[in-house]
Amino acid sequence: MAEFATIARPYAKALFGLAQEKSQIESWLGGLEKLAAVVQEGKVASLIDRPETNASEKADILIDLVGLKDKELKNFVIVLAGQKRLSILPEVYAQYQDLTLSFNHIKSAVIYSAYPLTDKQVGELAQMLNKRFDSELKISVEIEPELIGGIKVEVGDQVLDLSVRGKLSALYTTMTN
């Protein structure tokens, strides 16, 4: 996926720049989210990969499936289809979303937990993490049973590992060195 990220970056930046000019950042985020979801559906993904379907047909099908009304977003889909890049739409969406968060001075955080967290626990963690990272955070929670217990938090390239697995790994490293 690193290759997709590299390919998607200039598209996401260009689209975001245009969205800023047109004051359409949030509405285009919603459109991109729908496009990214549709492209990942099995039947649509196989249609995109089909060489016998021309680029304009692929673009039209996607535009119709999502119900895009915005002229610039339609043109964006047409450009991607013409360059055989429709499969990178999920990565374009992810990077556009990151640009939107950064523009709004919000960071994205992922809390990994061995067990499901209650809304109250997530709220308390959010307060602590907002202070710790001195920023407003958009938090998502993912369950990873292999953590054994505790949590691991990723904010950008920073990782805060408070899991049992992380502590056992640190103990193992200490004992073997």
Swiss-Prot record:
Q: How does it assemble?
A: F-type ATPases have 2 components, F(1) - the catalytic core - and F(0) - the membrane proton channel. F(1) has five subunits: alpha(3), beta(3), gamma(1), delta(1), epsilon(1). F(0) has three main subunits: a(1), b(2) and c(10-14). The alpha and beta chains form an alternating ring which encloses part of the gamma chain. F(1) is attached to F(0) by a central stalk formed by the gamma and epsilon chains, while a peripheral stalk is formed by the delta and b chains.
Q: Where in the cell is it found?
A: Cell inner membrane
Q: Which InterPro entries match?
A: ATP_synth_OSCP/delta_N_sf, ATPase_OSCP/d_CS, ATPase_OSCP/dsu
UniProt keyword list = ATP synthesis, Cell inner membrane, Cell membrane, CF(1), Hydrogen ion transport, Ion transport, Membrane, Transport
Origin organism lineage: Bacteria, Pseudomonadati, Pseudomonadota, Betaproteobacteria, Neisseriales
Q: Which HAMAP family match?
A: ATP_synth_delta_bact
Enumerate the SUPFAM superfamilies for this protein. Answer: N-terminal domain of the delta subunit of the F1F0-ATP synthase
The membrane-topology field of this record reads: Peripheral membrane protein
Drop me one GO molecular function for this one: proton-transporting ATP synthase activity, rotational mechanism
Function of this protein? Answer: F(1)F(0) ATP synthase produces ATP from ADP in the presence of a proton or sodium gradient. F-type ATPases consist of two structural domains, F(1) containing the extramembraneous catalytic core and F(0) containing the membrane proton channel, linked together by a central stalk and a peripheral stalk. During catalysis, ATP synthesis in the catalytic domain of F(1) is coupled via a rotary mechanism of the central stalk subunits to proton translocation.
Q: Known NCBIfam families for this protein?
A: ATP_synt_delta (TIGR01145), PRK05758.2-2 (NF004402)
Q: Does the keyword Zinc-finger apply?
A: no
Q: Which family does it belong to?
A: Belongs to the ATPase delta chain family.
**Has UniProt tagged this entry with the keyword DNA-binding?**
no
Q: GO cellular component terms?
A: plasma membrane; proton-transporting ATP synthase complex
The name on file for this protein is: ATP synthase subunit delta
